[in-house]
Amino acid sequence: MRLIASDLRSGVERLGDMIAEAKTIVPFTGAGISTECGIPDFRSPGGIWTRNRPIPFDGFVASQEARDESWRRRFAMEETFAAARPGRGHRALASLYRAGKVPAVITQNIDNLHQASGFAHEHVIELHGNTTYARCVGCGQTYQLDWVKRRFDQDGAPNCTVCDEPVKTATISFGQMMPEEEMQRATALSRACDLFIAIGSSLVVWPAAGFPMMAKRAGARLVIINREPTEQDDIADLVIRHDIGETLGPFVGN
């Protein structure tokens, strides 16, 4: 039976009961968990993609001009990403992780804030990659961004020193294949949990938006925490339409 929390307090109390009763909790996070940390949303009105049209993967690979523009945009955002620190939502999930309730987090975010909050790298399933380092699109060789920046300042967007294919941020661009291993791990986790908490996601980007449904079909209870309604509110057991930091803040340190 779906419950839309009438106020923040009742929502937090019900969420606390569900967390206490759960054995295995899988959080699924979207952009909303990071906006209080200063990371701008990409998709919402006024977001980055409304100001700069996304560069698709095939365009990046085919055009030096597109690669230069992609890296110019990334370095223009460097201060924002470098200054960001985990918010209350990240820290609350890390507390549940340390307590053994959360085996891993599934995220659509690329900002590395779950790792910064205390999650081991191998326990953060990044569906859309990570913008804090770079990877060759050919052989997969990884590079630190300071190396890319030095090359970029000298000669524009660099190619791989191993195979001479283009180097891009280790994120998933439009038209690029989703990471198979991460999708498989996210599927297994969604099917194995007894509480799935979707946080700060509009739940419209597929295939990632399928994980809450998958967990629900497998018998898990579903919580959705998002300021705006989502298309999956009707199947949720609890919907909390309040600030994420305020909602999850009471669970920091528990």
Curated annotation (Swiss-Prot):
Catalytic activity line of the entry: N(6)-acetyl-L-lysyl-[protein] + NAD(+) + H2O = 2''-O-acetyl-ADP-D-ribose + nicotinamide + L-lysyl-[protein]
User: Which EC class does it fall in?
Assistant: transferase
Q: Domain of life of the organism in this record?
A: Bacteria
Q: Per the database record, which ranges form the Deacetylase sirtuin-type domain?
A: 5-254
Family label: Belongs to the sirtuin family. Class U subfamily.
**Function text:** NAD-dependent protein deacetylase which modulates the activities of several enzymes which are inactive in their acetylated form.
- Its recorded name reads NAD-dependent protein deacetylase 1
Organism of origin = Bradyrhizobium diazoefficiens (strain JCM 10833 / BCRC 13528 / IAM 13628 / NBRC 14792 / USDA 110)
